[in-house]
Amino acid sequence: MDKNTITGLVLIGILLVGFSFLSRPSEEQIAAQKRYYDSIAVVQQQEEALRAKTEAALANEKEETAADSASLFFSATKGKEAFTTIQNNLVEITLDNKGGRVYSALLKNYMGQDKKPVVLFNGSDASMNFNFYNKKGALQTKDFYFEAVNKTDSSVTMRLAADSASYIDFIYTLKPDNYLMSFVIKATGMDGKLAASTNYVDISWSQRARQIEKGYTYENRLADLTYKYTGDDVDNLSASKDDEKSVSERLDWIAFKNQFFSSVFIAEQDFEKTTVKSKMEKQGSGYIKDYSAEMSTFFDPTGKQPTDMYFYFGPNHYKTLTALDKGREEKWELNNLVYLGWPLIRWINKWITINVFDWLSGWGLSMGIVLLLLTIMVKIVVFPATWKTYMSSAKMRVLKPKIDEINKKYPKQEDAMKKQQEVMGLYSQYGVSPMGGCLPMLLQFPILMALFMFVPSAIELRQQSFLWADDLSTYDAFITFPFHIPFLGNHLSLFCLLMTVTNILNTKYTMQQQDTGAQPQMAAMKWMMYLMPIMFLFVLNDYPSGLNYYYFISTLISVVTMIILRRTTDENKLLTELEAKKKDPKQMKKTGFAARLEAMQKQQEQLAKERANKQNKK
């Protein structure tokens, strides 16, 4: 460092020291500033003291208000949380003394993905509160500690006591071999202590439905909040978006539903003034839906009549749910929790599919074999309709050379009406109806759709393996991608891929079968017919492997049937038979659809000629 730099730094230092000395405040200024800050501190202390006093007053007011309404059960406002378990051979229920509510529900005979018994909910997953009323306000059971009395292995009474002679009992009882739990609310010695004019209890119930199955997308699609109108039909909230509804009608029950399991709350005296909500949960959160319901039901504060209710924590198994109505005059119809399709298809599944499926399952066969046999049986039932559809197409196919001649005769577009009229006349002469295969196809559609609706709801397929699929109730991912493909997901289902391939083959044979030349525009639509199976690959990739397996087997049988019928049908002989019918005078009479269509075409042609003549005269 040179001499000039050192000199400059020294001068700068002297300037800074001198400036600091000259700019310092005087003693009067320092004293005034100290008084100013002291006054601010005093004001702040006063404000803090006032705020603390106000908050304490508000807290005391809240405590006094709560104490006024809860003074009836003052001794129950303090306690230590404890749990009581009741069980039978099917279900284990844990009850919490805080609020006297159901804390958790475990199903012993059904395993989760972790190979442990399925837990429908536990702890903070669910909540339940009952509001009783006295002259001073609401008594919320969630704020009180109940006492467990009269405990057995399968029943317990959770008691909220005002004193030894005045209390409200929540009585829980599990029946043997049953997922149904009786729940009775009964007041004893509360006459005059609860508002006699209030003959109802308000209930708040909520549950976050856990993701129990492997496939979030499909399980979420079949999970919804369902409820049944008293003496009427069943309704539900949307399963695909957040939904809320206020229900003015009386309800028999409300169900928080997963794909294969449900938590159902049933009221013998009905629910009323009900509001139900369902919110979607994010994928990966471990939950699929957040359900909640607020409702009221009958309650007798005098204790003369108990409030009878039930909980059902169990599988969505059709016959299990149906059995709950045995001996009841007013049916709960909880079997509506199992979706079996539209009315006609549901009827087929209810009376035929389920019974045949149970019969085959009783042989102790693999569920994959049961589905195979069931599919074959369905194909046998619909074979007469399949054969009739095929023969109708075969007759039209052997007439294709004659149709081609008509097409050559009328090559111009303006002659389309004449060409169509002559084609229909040809069909009529040979006794062939172009719509002959449509009715049989429509008749077999409900039967084929019945299985399509039944398989995804069949809890019997849950965790049942077959070939490479470890669970027929969810997708079989034989390839898993480290990324997400739009509309496809992060995996590829092998049964879905096989189903797609067989559908393409089926489309090919069907198009060949229907290539009669009568509809040239079909050539432009062929690519759409081949596109449909590709679309199915994206749509059904997340669907249960059991469903894709059924669809694959069903389509494969259709392809094989088509090939066999094609090879065993002598088309020359068929044409000879048609020629013989043409020569038969009885066949010359135009009847049915073809005759009506031909008559309409002639009428349209006549009207067109009349309009043309009028225009020429002008």
Curated annotation (Swiss-Prot):
Chain segments annotated as transmembrane: 3-23, 363-383, 439-459, 478-498, 520-540, 545-565
GO molecular function: membrane insertase activity
GO cellular component, one term: plasma membrane
Signal sequence interval, chain numbering: none
Keywords on record: Cell inner membrane, Cell membrane, Chaperone, Membrane, Protein transport, Transmembrane, Transmembrane helix, Transport
GO biological process: protein insertion into membrane; protein transport
CDD domains referenced in this protein's UniProt entry, alphabetically: 5TM_YidC_Alb3, EcYidC-like_peri
Pfam families named in the record: 60KD_IMP, YidC_periplas
Cellular localization per UniProt: Cell inner membrane
Membrane topology: Multi-pass membrane protein
Function noted in UniProt: Required for the insertion and/or proper folding and/or complex formation of integral membrane proteins into the membrane. Involved in integration of membrane proteins that insert both dependently and independently of the Sec translocase complex, as well as at least some lipoproteins. Aids folding of multispanning membrane proteins.
Family the entry assigns: Belongs to the OXA1/ALB3/YidC family. Type 1 subfamily.
Subunit architecture: Interacts with the Sec translocase complex via SecD. Specifically interacts with transmembrane segments of nascent integral membrane proteins during membrane integration.
Protein name: Membrane protein insertase YidC
Organism annotation: Bacteroides fragilis (strain ATCC 25285 / DSM 2151 / CCUG 4856 / JCM 11019 / LMG 10263 / NCTC 9343 / Onslow / VPI 2553 / EN-2)
